[in-house]
């Protein structure tokens, strides 16, 4: 049996301010730092260890992973970073307050942008200061690869390309893997692993910094999955609450 651990980054500063974040590189809040420490302690107490770690090129996910591995005394574990594990790109919504955006465009429209699978938010323009294609972390992207906006299907396409080329072979080689990433990135992976329909993924929420464990067979088909707490596996359908850490 193969075990895979997925973890969404701890609360970010823009999560706290209720803003659309996407590819904007904001850091963790104080609460997010605490959540990451708690996640590391949970994994350590439950006897987990890792051979390889994957994350995005955004600091909120990277820092969460650093803290988790530090709490587990596993700072030696190799970390692979890829833009393909970035959060969904929210286009021209990035930086905007979600409540204010709902007042401007209507709650129904914002809900469609946020939760639908195939509808993209308004796109950035290439002269927008939020367009960061020249950032050194994206120097390997070919012309036209840097997104101006994304729907969940777009996110899923790049995430699964990286899954099949990099992560799946690592798991099949017998390595214990943790992925520290973002809400929509993990939703994309869960949709694929659990073979969820487009309707099924609409209501799927991934909590910040709670370890989600997938037990997989030799072909990486899910046997079962569950969240972890200090007391071990959490009953199906329940999500543990954070404690002060």
From Swiss-Prot:
EC number, as in UniProt: 5.4.2.11
Binding site for substrate: 8-15, 21-22, 60, 87-90, 98, 114-115, 183-184
GO molecular function (one): phosphoglycerate mutase activity
Function: Catalyzes the interconversion of 2-phosphoglycerate and 3-phosphoglycerate.
Coiled coil ranges: none
Catalyzed reactions per annotation: (2R)-2-phosphoglycerate = (2R)-3-phosphoglycerate
Cited InterPro entries: His_Pase_superF_clade-1, His_PPase_superfam, PG/BPGM_mutase_AS, Phosphogly_mut1
Gene Ontology terms describing biological process: gluconeogenesis; glycolytic process
Pathway: Carbohydrate degradation; glycolysis; pyruvate from D-glyceraldehyde 3-phosphate: step 3/5
Active site location: 9, 87
Keywords: Gluconeogenesis, Glycolysis, Isomerase
Positions bearing the site annotation: Transition state stabilizer: 182
This protein's name: 2,3-bisphosphoglycerate-dependent phosphoglycerate mutase
Family affiliation: Belongs to the phosphoglycerate mutase family. BPG-dependent PGAM subfamily.
Gene3D superfamilies, alphabetized: Phosphoglycerate mutase-like (3.40.50.1240)
Domain of life: Bacteria
């Amino acid at each position: 049996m193969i075990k895979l651990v997925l973890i969404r980054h701890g609360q970010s500063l823009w999560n706290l301010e209720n803003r659309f974040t996407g590819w904007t590189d904001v850091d963790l809040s104080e609460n997010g730092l605490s959540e990451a420490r708690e996640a590391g302690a949970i994994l350590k107490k439950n006897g987990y260890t890792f051979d390889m770690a994957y994350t995005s090129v955004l600091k909120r996910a990277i820092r969460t992973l650093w803290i988790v591995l530090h709490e587990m005394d596993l700072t030696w574990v190799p970390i692979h970073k890829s833009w393909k594990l970035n959060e969904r790109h929210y286009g021209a919504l990035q930086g905007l307050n979600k409540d204010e955006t709902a007042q401007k465009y209507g709650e129904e429209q914002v809900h469609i942008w946020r939760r639908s699978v195939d509808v993209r938010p308004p796109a950035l323009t290439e002269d927008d200061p939020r367009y960061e294609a020249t950032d050194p972390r994206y120097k390997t992207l070919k012309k036209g690869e840097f997104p101006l906006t994304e729907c969940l299907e777009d996110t899923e396409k790049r995430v699964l390309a990286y899954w099949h080329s990099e992560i799946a072979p690592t798991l099949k080689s017998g390595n214990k893997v943790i992925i520290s990433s973002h809400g929509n990135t993990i939703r994309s992976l869960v949709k694929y692993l659990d073979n969820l329909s487009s309707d099924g993924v609409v209501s799927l929420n991934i909590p910040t910094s709670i370890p989600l464990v997938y037990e997989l067979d030799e072909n990486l088909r899910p046997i079962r999955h569950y969240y972890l707490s200090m007391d071990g596996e959490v009953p199906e359908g329940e999500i543990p609450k954070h404690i002060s850490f």
